[in-house]
Curated annotation (Swiss-Prot):
Residues 5-267 form the Pyruvate carboxyltransferase domain. Homodimer. SMART domains: LeuA_dimer. This is 2-isopropylmalate synthase. Its EC number is 2.3.3.13. It is found in: Cytoplasm. The keyword Membrane does not apply. Gene3D superfamilies: 1.10.238.260, 3.30.160.270, Aldolase class I. It catalyses: 3-methyl-2-oxobutanoate + acetyl-CoA + H2O = (2S)-2-isopropylmalate + CoA + H(+). Belongs to the alpha-IPM synthase/homocitrate synthase family. LeuA type 1 subfamily. The keyword Cytoplasm applies.
Amino acid sequence: MSDRVIIFDTTLRDGEQALAASLTVKEKLQIALALERLGVDVMEVGFPVSSPGDFESVQTIARTVKNSRVCALSRALEKDIDAAAQALSVADQFRIHTFISTSTIHVESKLKRSFDQVLEMAVGAVKYARRFTDDVEFSCEDAGRTPIDNLCRMVEEAIKAGARTINIPDTVGYTVPSEFGGIIQTLFNRVPNIDQAVISVHCHDDLGLSVANSITAVQHGARQIECTVNGIGERAGNCSLEEIAMILSTRKGELGLETGINAKEIHRTSSLVSQLCNMPVQANKAIVGANAFTHSSGIHQDGMLKAQNTYEIMTPESIGLNRNNLNMTSRSGRHVIKHRMSELGYGDQDYDMDVLYEDFLVLADKKGQVFDYDLEALAFMEAQAEDDDHFKLQQLVVHSDSTEGSATATVKVEVNGETVTEAAIGNGPVDAAYKAVARASGCEIDITSYQLGAKGEGQNALGQVDITASYRNQNFHGVGLATDVVEASVKALVHVMNLTWRADKVADCKQKIQQEKQVLGGV
């Protein structure tokens, strides 16, 4: 048996079903090209019979993608298979994936047929699909709850009809690994022609077991895993592609299996899917979450500085990230602060470590996470009170035109003790307010990330705006809280402006230090 596991990505079919709004054809193509770079073997990109838009997107992707096999879904109906075949016909290589329910509850309650009738439909669908391609996949929907005798019979007959891949889905995420592994093992033991097809699994995450069930399945002989980027999909989602890829890579010695995934594309692909699907990745998500390579505990940070593999079983570089993160919090030890100052280019002679660490702990207790620009300001600026701001918002007035979508904002901003009033027109109230503040302050800041949340519940909830801004090749993080979203947005911007002002002051201090070093070096 081959030790190569086929990765069948269904982000653009099962994954898209979870979205509040459908992706455009252009967005689907972007994701498909990213999946091709990632190295997926097969990508299921839609259900052509379902709508003209889905048909168009499948056809566009089939025409464009060259290095992955493009697949489309169809029910066990000739009209579905016709639509799939027509949409895929422009591809160099393609697969038709047809399915029918096999569990008793589905057969009797949903299809209202006998199992023998369903079996006949399945065989007919596979034979019909084979008229268009040799690559036909057949799925036994709700296989996890299908009586094993019926499942074995269905698999044997589908293979006889010409299916070259047999998919065993845990459609409702009901089975546990030992149970699901037993199903796969039983198929290999009892289906006489099982060696004529690749056994695939498609596990859902309703009980949080989709990845575990998929890994158990390949340990029992399955050689295709159906999955999605970031695990998106129906209800609680699907088996996560990135988790499967890195499990098989990291534990290759134990499992003896491999994939064709280019792991260095994982982070980029995950970010693209998250952005286009408007589905943020939870911070503690395995492999691609913001905290996956972030260490906050002082003990862990100390271990990481001594040997990276003390607390990391894979490197961030392996999935396309540049580095891990040691979050500077009140739990960080002196060693971490000294290490970070060294990375920023400072020697022991440039600052007082005792004073810096004492001030750091005070600031960390106050704001939680301390960033590089905070640390440099603590080291080189005497006045570090955060309420002693260079910029202060005094007044904000916004008028919106609901018919045209434009808005006018007037702001009063205190700049170094003097009040400056400015107005601006923008594409919406936040844009107008940001332009007015920029005029008043003279600061041109590039906003790279904007997130809106809430603190509290009901009518008393505060809008929280978190922004990331780029200024002189450095990222700054600002937060604003207010009952009004526009006001919260402006407060976040003013927060960033004060951080960049301090950063400029720190840069002046750094320049003086360098000049003093040069003078001393020349003496």
